């Protein structure tokens, strides 16, 4: 908690900011002036410009006494049991979600911190633990890989209530990927009950293993379709795509307005348009420069589609674009695949515009950002063939009900 929230909490609990005062609904002794709502101002522990405990940026949070440091005592220690020298039957919380880490060179990069609260709360071994947190840990999130693995293998996870739209919990608040609240039960050991909640009216419930995949598939209705793809033995597109920043150009790179005289230049595609750079500046994937490349934007369109009405369907990705030989990209884009001829590149670009591949992507997304792992359930096929959704539905033996679900969830690509 911060100083302000500690004062507000005491006023709510005791009708007084100072529980040892005569105005407190329950008067604590002078030795406990804060009652049971303890606040102690502490400082971050800086190492190489970051807090050792929460990863906050020193430039942002190395502040004077007049400003809140947001160095939350509950997570700024190595032994939370010594801090909380008491037993807890129940822990309930809505922890802080993130703090600026000074990354990206813009000062707006943020690092999740909510998982530290969850992990430390577990260390206290309460009978029950429930917290509401962003759902980005399901399949992504900066620095959340170990946390995701720990949560997916925790057999004490009894219930996850998943809201794909954060506004169903927090009206007017858009959190890309939605939010969830979970019940962790110390005495429980088994599969987890997953509740898909949408529009405050519809809840789809199933009980299943959390660790079936290396990411959490939140949509209960998608599981059977994913199983059918995996049973087919077809390759995964994730094993054949390129990682971010395939040529070594960061998002801010723009190049020159025209080719440089006397220099072997290639075209650079950035979020600002087109420029020209010396081919010598390409730092990796040199063999791909002369090929046709199929690219998409690296983020989910429309601010993560947080305002999309599910009845209208989701796009999931931007439209695919084909780049010619001697055209490269900055890390504002993802390079999905390269081809020696334009016909196969065109076939693949049209394939990625189909509903089925985007449906299979959709269930691995929990934030605005797209990465290689989001293609792990997208089939990698022979692109000498021009595929259709109908061909894919037949290939993976989808039922009429499953086909209708895919068709209703994903909108046509313009």
Model-derived regions: residue spans:
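Class I S-adenosyl-L-methionine
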Residues: 1-26, 31-32, 60, 374-414
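C-terminal substrate-recognition regions of SAM-dependent nucleic acid methyltransferases
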Residues: 82, 86, 166-400
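Hydrophobic alpha-helical segments
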Residues: 103, 311, 411-413
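Short amphipathic alpha-helical surface patches that mediate protein-protein
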Residues: 134, 353, 408-411
């Amino acid at each position: 908690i911060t100083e302000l929230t500690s004062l507000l909490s005491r006023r709510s609990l005791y009708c007084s900011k100072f529980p040892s005062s005569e105005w407190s609904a329950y008067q604590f002794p002078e030795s406990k002036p804060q009652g049971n709502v303890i606040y102690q101002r502490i400082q971050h522990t800086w190492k190489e410009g970051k807090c050792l405990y929460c990863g906050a940026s020193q430039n942002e949070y190395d502040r004077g006494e007049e400003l809140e440091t947001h160095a939350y005592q509950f997570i700024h220690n190595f032994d939370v049991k010594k801090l909380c020298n008491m037993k807890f039957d129940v822990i309930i919380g809505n922890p802080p979600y993130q703090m600026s880490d000074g990354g990206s060179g813009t000062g707006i990069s943020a690092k999740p911190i909510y998982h530290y609260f969850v992990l430390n709360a577990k260390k206290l071994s309460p009978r029950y633990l429930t917290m509401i947190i962003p759902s980005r840990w399901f399949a992504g999130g900066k620095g959340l890989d170990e946390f995701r693995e720990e949560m997916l293998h925790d057999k004490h996870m009894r219930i996850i209530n998943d809201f794909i739209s954060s506004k169903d919990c927090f009206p007017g608040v858009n959190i890309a990927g939605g939010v969830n609240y979970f019940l962790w039960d110390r005495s429980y050991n088994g599969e987890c009950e997953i509740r898909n909640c949408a529009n405050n009216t519809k809840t789809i419930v199933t009980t299943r293993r959390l660790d079936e995949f290396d990411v959490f598939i939140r949509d209960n209705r998608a599981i059977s379709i994913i199983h059918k793809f995996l049973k087919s033995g077809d390759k995964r597109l994730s094993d054949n795509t390129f990682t971010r920043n395939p040529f070594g150009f960061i998002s801010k790179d723009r190049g020159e307005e025209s080719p440089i005289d006397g220099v072997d230049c290639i075209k650079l595609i950035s979020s600002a348009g087109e420029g020209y750079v010396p081919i010598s500046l390409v730092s990796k994937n040199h063999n791909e420069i002369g090929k046709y490349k199929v690219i998409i934007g690296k983020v989910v369109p429309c601010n993560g589609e947080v305002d999309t009405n599910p009845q209208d369907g989701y796009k999931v990705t931007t439209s695919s674009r084909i780049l010619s030989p001697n055209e490269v990209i900055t890390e504002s884009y993802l390079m999905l695949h390269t081809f020696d001829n334009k016909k196969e590149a065109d076939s693949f670009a049209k394939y990625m515009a189909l509903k089925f591949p985007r449906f299979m992507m959709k269930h691995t997304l929990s934030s605005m950002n797209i990465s290689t792992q989001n293609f792990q359930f997208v089939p990698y096929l022979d692109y000498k063939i021009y595929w259709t959704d109908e061909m894919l539905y037949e290939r993976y033996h989808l039922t009429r009900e499953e086909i209708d679900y895919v068709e209703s969830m994903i909108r046509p690509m313009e």
